[in-house]
């Protein structure tokens, strides 16, 4: 595997500078995200010499662990989640920068002990007062953690102290606004990094370059040439061990309002004045403010929810959502959501955007598909000569890349046409173009680059778009009225009707 420093796509490019040494404080450090994603991402950056060796990680959680036990747990987690990663001499050096501070989210004494430890580590590790506080805890704990950090004086330096907040940011518009008020009481906006790890993926970042750096595509990126857009994020897994969280969230809050909305924004936004954080985020806010559900008066024509029922995945029988451990047998929580957006602006007027996401679907895939209009000519009328619309697809996962489908004549004496794909894949370079995206996001946060993080008004604008659906779906409902789809299938029948009513159909992936 070729390392990032040997990535052929980066040949001839100036490397991003190295951030200053700093302490990264992870709240909720006993959770699996820490050993599955966060610590491995930071270790990857260290292996690639993208962060200084003085970089220090402090885990915070309720369990009474020692520094050494925390290091052992992180190593065990690395061995389990990333068995191919070398944990030799470099890991031993890296792990000496791992520390632990036990404490409760709502206990001021815990924060004072943490503050004392951070001061000691500044002297010992040479981190110069630079801090990143990463909230990897249940969303209900966000306000209290921020209040305790703020009142304890740990967010007071607007240039050295940064706050990273995992999604979801709120559970509706009102709670997002309330959380923003808490954040703004103790932080400047430039200190706050609302993380969405989808924005760390190569293909997502490549969207802006693909659109605005290539003259052959941007002129076609509008209502004159685009028939519709489909954005899909499909998962094969079920709720697994997240029933407690998922029952209160569902597919709309867990996936569509954040991950899919970010893909949507980058697809639909106007060109920013500059490739900097505020310019890009301002354009995302503008397109969100112009976005609406297609029909809020007849919600079924613009939004569909569903739940997976018992079925088969890869030859194995799997239970339905309501029979999963920890799930209410009468749950109305959606594991599938499909929505139709319209954009009231000059570029996209009349072009529908169809977004869908679900669990227990036939395959794990995330993509953006731009469906162009069919040619107006009737010259290809016979069945053998029938042409198909061009489709530009950006694959987010797996096999990240970009493909363009177009029609050609088949070789031979007969005049027959067929569709072919012109394809670019990051894998063709012999590199792993993406990891879990957290390494890029960590590095950007350490460098103070907010481009791939959401701004306060952007979060609120995204919640505003889906509020009409939430207001209906959050109301008590008869469980028998929730559409079902068998595990291992693509969607409930009602979701098919959502797009079929417009004379279109979902892509079969």
UniProtKB/Swiss-Prot annotation:
Cross-referenced InterPro entries: G6P_DH, G6P_DH_AS, G6P_DH_C, G6P_DH_NAD-bd, NAD(P)-bd_dom_sf
Associated pathway: Carbohydrate degradation; pentose phosphate pathway; D-ribulose 5-phosphate from D-glucose 6-phosphate (oxidative stage): step 1/3
Record: residues binding NADP(+): 62, 104-105, 167
Residues at the active site: 259 (proton acceptor)
UniProt keyword annotations, A-Z: Carbohydrate metabolism, Glucose metabolism, NADP, Oxidoreductase
GO cellular component terms, semicolon-separated: cytosol
Enzyme Commission number(s) from the entry: 1.1.1.49
Catalytic activity from the UniProt record: D-glucose 6-phosphate + NADP(+) = 6-phospho-D-glucono-1,5-lactone + NADPH + H(+)
GO molecular function: glucose-6-phosphate dehydrogenase activity; NADP binding
Enzyme class: oxidoreductase
Signal peptide: none
PROSITE patterns reported in the protein's UniProt record: G6P_DEHYDROGENASE
Entry annotated with the keyword Glycoprotein: no
Binding residue positions for substrate: 197, 201, 235, 254, 359, 364
Pfam families reported for this sequence: G6PD_C, G6PD_N
Role this protein plays: Catalyzes the oxidation of glucose 6-phosphate to 6-phosphogluconolactone.
Similarity annotation: Belongs to the glucose-6-phosphate dehydrogenase family.
Name recorded for this polypeptide: Glucose-6-phosphate 1-dehydrogenase
């Amino acid at each position: 595997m070729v390392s990032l420093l040997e990535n052929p796509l980066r040949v001839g490019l100036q490397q991003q500078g190295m951030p200053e040494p700093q302490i990264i404080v992870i709240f909720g450090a006993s959770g699996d995200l820490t050993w599955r994603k966060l610590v491995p991402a930071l270790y990857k950056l260290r292996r690639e010499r993208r962060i200084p060796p003085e970089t220090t990680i402090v885990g915070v959680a309720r369990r009474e662990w020692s520094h050494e036990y925390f290091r052992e747990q992180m190593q065990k987690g690395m061995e389990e989640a990333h068995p191919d990663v070398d944990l030799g001499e470099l890991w031993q050096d890296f792990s000496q920068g791992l520390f632990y501070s036990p404490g409760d989210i709502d206990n001021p004494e815990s924060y004072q002990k943490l503050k004392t430890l951070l001061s000691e580590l500044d002297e010992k590790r040479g981190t110069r007062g630079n801090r990143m506080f990463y909230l990897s805890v249940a969303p209900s704990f966000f306000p209290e953690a921020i209040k305790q950090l703020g009142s304890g004086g740990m967010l007071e330096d607007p240039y050295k102290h940064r706050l990273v907040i995992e999604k979801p940011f709120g559970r509706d518009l009102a709670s997002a606004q309330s959380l923003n008020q808490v954040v703004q009481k103790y932080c400047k906006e430039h200190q706050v990094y609302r993380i969405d790890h989808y924005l760390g993926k190569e293909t997502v970042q490549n969207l802006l370059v693909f659109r605005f750096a290539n003259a052959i595509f941007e002129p076609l990126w509008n209502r004159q040439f685009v028939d519709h857009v489909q954005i899909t994020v499909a998962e094969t897994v079920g709720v697994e061990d997240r029933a407690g969280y998922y029952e209160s969230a569902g597919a709309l809050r867990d996936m569509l309002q954040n991950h899919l909305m970010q893909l949507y924004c980058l697809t639909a936004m106007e060109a920013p004045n500059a490739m900097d954080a505020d310019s890009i985020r301002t354009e995302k806010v503008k397109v969100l403010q112009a976005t609406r559900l297609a029909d809020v008066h007849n919600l079924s024509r613009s939004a569909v929810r569903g739940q997976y029922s018992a079925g088969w995945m890869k030859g194995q029988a799997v239970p339905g959502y309501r029979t999963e451990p920890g799930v209410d047998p009468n749950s109305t929580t959606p594991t599938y959501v499909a929505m139709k957006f319209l954009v009231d602006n000059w570029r996209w007027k009349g072009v529908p955007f169809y977004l869908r996401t679900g669990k227990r679907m036939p395959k794990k895939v995330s993509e953006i598909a731009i469906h162009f209009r069919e040619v107006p000519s009737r010259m290809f009328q016979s069945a053998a000569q029938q042409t198909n619309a061009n489709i530009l697809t950006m694959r987010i996962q797996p096999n990240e890349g970009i493909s363009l489908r177009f029609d050609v004549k088949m070789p031979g004496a007969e005049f027959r046409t067929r569709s072919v794909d012109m394809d670019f894949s990051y894998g063709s370079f012999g590199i792993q173009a993406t990891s879990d995206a957290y390494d890029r996001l960590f590095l950007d946060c350490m460098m103070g680059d907010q481009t791939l993080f959401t701004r306060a008004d952007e979060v609120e604008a995204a919640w505003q778009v889906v509020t009409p659906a939430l207001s209906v779906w959050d109301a008590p409902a008869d469980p028998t009225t929730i559409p079902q789809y068998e595990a291992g299938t693509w969607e409930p029948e009602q979701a098919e009707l959502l797009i079929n009513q417009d004379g279109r159909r979902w892509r079969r992936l």
